[in-house]
């Protein structure tokens, strides 16, 4: 007698969907899309046109998800050896390397077509360059080659505000580059704080993160210096007349908080401070760009 079919006797479609979704790093992409949206809004003195808004966000999100999936694919060996990442879909065998590559290629191609057709070729090619910068230049080479991997590779991750700007204007602007500078300077202290917390794991898999190659104390000093540089960069939108009083106040408070956390990390020997700095940096960037957005509409 034939055995009745049951959901448990086949791979779960729901679990498979979740595995592919996880490979796109949705939380990272969500924060990135906030910076894209802010770039779009600051580029326009009026309400955003619907077509480049929707197509731009969708296309950029898809290509960012593609880059994240390629990151999962390239890092699958070291991910399986680190406590933070061992449960990812590829190390656990929930997705094969071939399917991960096909998924990343499909997602990236669809995103590129959407951007090229419904926004403009400039944004499509800039987003493609960011994908190559993150997935191939940073993940496949820089990450394993130099302790300055985050600094050099951070440029690709700093591009989203510029992508948002070009999506609605089809041109470069100096104001968009200011936003790129802010994220570029934010990236090293954000990742170095995590690298301090996970130093032993990075050393185990031979990834030359700064705390591994130069020591924790040197890295703490670099984090503090970068937060000071970041605080100065965060004032640039005010100095060039791009933003007003609301942003100035919010930026000053956030920068003070970030510097204070970095100072604590440097001069207080307390367990868990590195992860506190890491988490604070996420809120810092999110709230900073929300302040840019609110200021733009309240003081326009």
UniProtKB/Swiss-Prot annotation:
Compartment(s): Cell inner membrane
Pathway annotation from the record: Porphyrin-containing compound metabolism; heme O biosynthesis; heme O from protoheme: step 1/1
Pfam families per the UniProt record, alphabetical: UbiA (PF01040)
Sorted UniProt keywords: Cell inner membrane, Cell membrane, Heme biosynthesis, Membrane, Transferase, Transmembrane, Transmembrane helix
Gene Ontology biological process terms from the UniProt entry: heme O biosynthetic process
Transmembrane segments annotated in the record for this chain: 28-48, 54-74, 100-120, 122-142, 149-169, 176-196, 222-242, 243-263, 280-300
Assigned EC number: 2.5.1.141
Main localization (coarse): membrane
GO cellular component: plasma membrane
Enzyme class: transferase
Annotated membrane topology: Multi-pass membrane protein
Any GO MF annotation of the entry: protoheme IX farnesyltransferase activity
Catalytic activity, as annotated: heme b + (2E,6E)-farnesyl diphosphate + H2O = Fe(II)-heme o + diphosphate
NCBIfam families: cyoE_ctaB, PRK04375.1-2
Sequence similarity: Belongs to the UbiA prenyltransferase family. Protoheme IX farnesyltransferase subfamily.
HAMAP family documented for this protein: CyoE_CtaB (MF_00154)
Miscellaneous field: Carbon 2 of the heme B porphyrin ring is defined according to the Fischer nomenclature.
Function recorded in the entry: Converts heme B (protoheme IX) to heme O by substitution of the vinyl group on carbon 2 of heme B porphyrin ring with a hydroxyethyl farnesyl side group.
Protein known as: Protoheme IX farnesyltransferase 1
């Amino acid at each position: 007698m034939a055995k009745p079919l049951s959901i448990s006797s086949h791979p779960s479609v729901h679990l498979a969907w979740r595995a592919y979704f996880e490979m796109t790093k949705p939380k990272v992409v969500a924060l990135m899309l906030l910076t894209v949206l802010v770039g779009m809004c600051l580029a326009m003195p009026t309400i955003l046109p619907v077509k480049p808004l929707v197509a731009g966000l969708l296309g950029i999100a898809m290509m960012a998800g593609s880059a994240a999936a390629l990151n999962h694919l390239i890092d699958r060996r070291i991910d399986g050896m680190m406590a933070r990442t061992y449960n990812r879909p590829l190390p656990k065998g929930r997705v094969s390397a071939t399917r991960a590559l096909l998924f990343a290629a499909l997602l990236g191609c669809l995103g590129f077509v959407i951007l090229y057709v419904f926004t403009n070729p400039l944004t499509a090619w800039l987003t493609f360059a960011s994908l190559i910068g993150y997935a191939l230049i940073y993940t496949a080479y820089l990450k394993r080659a130099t302790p300055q991997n985050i600094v050099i590779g951070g440029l690709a991750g700093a591009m989203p505000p510029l992508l948002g700007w070009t999506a609605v204007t089809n041109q470069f602007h100096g104001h968009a580059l200011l936003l790129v500078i802010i994220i570029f300077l934010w990236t090293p202290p954000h990742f170095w704080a995590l690298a301090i917390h996970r130093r032993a794991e990075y050393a185990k898999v031979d990834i030359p993160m700064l705390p591994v190659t130069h020591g924790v104390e040197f890295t703490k000093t670099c984090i503090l210096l970068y937060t000071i540089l970041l605080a100065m960069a965060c004032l640039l939108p005010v100095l060039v007349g791009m933003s007003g009083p609301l942003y100035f106040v919010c930026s000053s408070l956030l920068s003070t908080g970030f510097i204070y956390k970095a100072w604590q990390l440097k001069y207080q020997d307390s367990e868990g401070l590195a992860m506190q700095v890491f988490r604070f940096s996420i809120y810092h960037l999110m709230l900073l760009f929300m302040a840019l957005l609110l200021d733009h509409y309240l003081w326009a």
